[in-house]
């Protein structure tokens, strides 16, 4: 009944993965991002992640895997996602939704920390403001994005961009795979002396 749809969906995802893998710069950027995050942990710094909607879920998942466990038991790593609903509703109400991430970074971000900003379109104003605030704090910025990276293009230290201009779910599927690979490499880097 729906087999054609199922095959079509998997084929579409496969093509996006294939196109991404052909861009060697993106593969290099994943490696650079993982090494940068591991180095920040070794320097007793933290990573702060943020995103909206499905990207918010990815940001939470990223910090959960780092503070808890991925594939093997190990010590937790200092990762925070900007996800507290009371905080988000308070700042959204008092200052505006565009400041929910930047005010958090203003409060807890420090030199040497890292911001992982996730946006499928690259056009969310609250993500742009988060990046700007992180730069003021002399934090390093890594972005996971899609399409053509939108307004956040060239604002980060490391940009990982999924070359897809269709539905955002395809970009999110790639983002979660990238997040898992980042964590895997971070763990390997943290085992080095």
Curated annotation (Swiss-Prot):
InterPro entries to which the protein is assigned, alphabetical: GmhA/DiaA, Phosphoheptose_Isoase, SIS_dom, SIS_dom_sf, SIS_GmhA/DiaA_subfam
Keyword Metal-binding: yes
Entry cofactors: Zn(2+)
Assembly and binders: Homotetramer.
PROSITE patterns associated with the record: SIS
Protein name: Phosphoheptose isomerase
Segments traversing the membrane: none
Function statement: Catalyzes the isomerization of sedoheptulose 7-phosphate in D-glycero-D-manno-heptose 7-phosphate.
One function term, GO molecular function aspect: carbohydrate derivative binding
GO biological process: carbohydrate metabolic process; D-glycero-D-manno-heptose 7-phosphate biosynthetic process
GO CC terms, sorted: cytoplasm
PANTHER family: PHOSPHOHEPTOSE ISOMERASE (PTHR30390:SF7), SEDOHEPTULOSE 7-PHOSPHATE ISOMERASE / DNAA INITIATOR-ASSOCIATING FACTOR FOR REPLICATION INITIATION (PTHR30390)
Listed pathway(s): Carbohydrate biosynthesis; D-glycero-D-manno-heptose 7-phosphate biosynthesis; D-glycero-alpha-D-manno-heptose 7-phosphate and D-glycero-beta-D-manno-heptose 7-phosphate from sedoheptulose 7-phosphate: step 1/1
Record's cofactor remark: Binds 1 zinc ion per subunit.
Catalytic function, reaction form: 2 D-sedoheptulose 7-phosphate = D-glycero-alpha-D-manno-heptose 7-phosphate + D-glycero-beta-D-manno-heptose 7-phosphate
EC number: 5.3.1.28
Main localization of the protein described in the UniProt heading: cytoplasm
UniProt: Zn(2+) binding residues: 61, 65, 172, 180
Gene3D superfamilies for this protein: Glucose-6-phosphate isomerase like protein, domain 1
Name of the top EC class for this enzyme: isomerase
Domain SIS: 37-193
Any further remark recorded for this protein: The reaction produces a racemic mixture of D-glycero-alpha-D-manno-heptose 7-phosphate and D-glycero-beta-D-manno-heptose 7-phosphate. B.aphidicola is not able to make lipopolysaccharides (LPS), and except lpcA and kdtB, the genes responsible for the biosynthesis of the LPS components are missing from the genome.
Organism: Buchnera aphidicola subsp. Acyrthosiphon pisum (strain APS) (Acyrthosiphon pisum symbiotic bacterium)
